[in-house]
Amino acid sequence: MCMFINIGGGRSIDVIYIMECKEEKNYYNAAMRQINGDSLCLSTYQYLKRNEEWIGRYENFLKGKRSLPLLYDPFFKKIFNPVERRDRLSELVSCLLGQKVTVLEVFPNEDSQFLGVMIIMDMVVMMADGSIANIEIQKISYDFPAERISCYSADLVLRQYKMITGKNQGRKHEASMNGSSKPSYKDMRNVHTIILFEDSNKSLISDMDKALYFHVGKTRFNTGVKIELLQDFVLVSLDTFRKYRYSDIREGRTEITDYDYDSSQYNDELVSEKMKRDRLKFLSLFVAETPQEIDRLIEIFPDLESVRQDINEYLERPGEVLSMFSEALRILDRNTAELMVDRMKDEMEALKVQKDELKAQNEELKSSSEEKDAEIARLKKLLEEQNK
């Protein structure tokens, strides 16, 4: 916010702006004093300095030049804390799923065989109707997205089944939702896999229109039989959203388009206009990079003011936010390393196959050469006999 004070002669000075710049600089200086005076913070800071991009993000946040990277696990789970910010998290899940939901609980990642592997953020939540949703964010466009998504969704189904059969500690009271002593499959509810891709691979570029960014998937049968399977999928290409939609929203053009909401995929009676607008609001928040961008979004979506306040609170807690940055970097480093290992394994397997093929070709050539040598020897012998 800037305030111009006229001092005569048509001139003005931006007093508030100068004060804010000074305050931003003081946040950085105060943070550096705290870091240098704490051996643990200093060690964490040195770790972060090994990555030029991430130390830049941290310092620029303190200087008021960058916002927090909300699409990383430590930051997301603070801003969308399921206890302190349950309403905000429920709003997010509601607008992504296209139905009103209330988040009841968040499950730990370690309960899963698949979740938390090669991803930036994952959160498994249960809604008021008993259905389960997994929210995941991928920073890197990983290989085999269809296979990974299928595994994540299957894991959610298994989690819910274990709850119903009473295998999970603390959930035996949910052994049967219909009053029977024996769990029933009809107690199962939908599971929703929500994945936000920061860097979409080519499989997420629609042949219909490259600007389509919100992909909704369900299993349907060619005969039209009414068998509703449990697994639903929502895949959001944030880079596509930023490229083709975000600039319009920043200009105030927030009318809902077919790119934002495909009515054929939802029950319109369950989807409010607020949910549609919330979808634009949260996706815009996720791709915003600077405080100035967030300020502009607040003019369009005033209820983002509470998010800005939560973000700004971390300017007063540089040690805590430093730990969050270092944790996010460790997750990214681990995921990148695992991705590289997987790709190296694939390359080694491909080289092995190539080696085997070359070996087979060599054997064929050797066999062919031996046959030719034998034929030459036979012809020589025949020629010698004819010359006698």
Which residue stretches match the model-derived regions?
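Elongated, amphipathic alpha-helical interaction scaffolds
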Residues: 2-388
